[in-house]
Swiss-Prot record:
Annotated protein name in UniProt: Peptide deformylase
PANTHER family for this protein: PEPTIDE DEFORMYLASE
GO molecular function: metal ion binding; peptide deformylase activity
Gene3D superfamilies found in the cross-reference section: Peptide deformylase
Keyword check for Glycoprotein: no
Reaction catalysed by this enzyme: N-terminal N-formyl-L-methionyl-[peptide] + H2O = N-terminal L-methionyl-[peptide] + formate
Binding site for Fe cation: C91, H133, H137
Record Pfam families: Pep_deformylase
NCBIfam families in UniProt: pept_deformyl, PRK00150.1-3
Enzyme Commission number, as recorded: 3.5.1.88
Family: Belongs to the polypeptide deformylase family.
Length: 167
């Protein structure tokens, strides 16, 4: 297993639309293991493959307290949304930035697991929010895209300044 580099906004590769996974095989399972290791190493609760410059429809999530209940979603699709909720979100690709985002309160998602088997999952609370956030990444969308242009520009400038200091 390997820790992967997480792309940071404003990296344009984050805007890539992910492609369907044609076959769930050992190569895909290695990607999943590396993504989980990266997510845990970065103290995240979710990670989309596009965030680590792999442009396939793969998401890993773990919202459990003990960080021992990983959820793998391959080729996920939200098939039902209900209600609305506002949540404060952050993102490994937009470090140290948080904003309130409107999301569906509950979602039903259809996906493949790491054995390539289809399943359907009903999610609410943090899991529903995380699923929506990560699936946005697969479409090249970031949580800051829900913000006003002014707020988005402030975050961009802040991250560019932090990147200069890190060099």
């Amino acid at each position: 297993m390997a820790t992967l580099e997480v792309l940071r906004f404003p990296d344009e590769r984050l805007r890539t639309i992910a492609q369907e996974v044609a076959h769930v095989d050992d190569q895909v399972r290695v990607i999943i293991k590396d993504m989980l290791e990266t997510m845990y190493d970065e103290n995240g609760i979710g990670l989309a493959a596009t965030q680590v410059n792999i442009h396939q429809r793969i998401v890993v999530i773990d919202v459990s307290e003990e960080r021992n209940e990983p959820l793998v979603l391959i080729n996920p699709q939200i098939i039902k949304k209900d209600g609305t909720t506002v949540s404060e979100e952050g993102c490994l690709s937009v470090p140290n930035s948080y904003a309130k985002v409107d999301r569906a309160e509950t979602v039903t998602v259809a996906a493949l697991n790491e054995q390539g088997e289809e399943f359907v999952l009903d999610a609410d609370e943090l899991l529903a929010i995380c699923i929506q956030h990560e699936l946005d990444h697969l479409q090249g969308k970031l949580f800051i895209d829900y913000l006003s242009p002014l707020k988005r520009q402030r975050i961009r400038k802040k991250l560019e300044k932090e990147a200069k200091f890190a060099e």
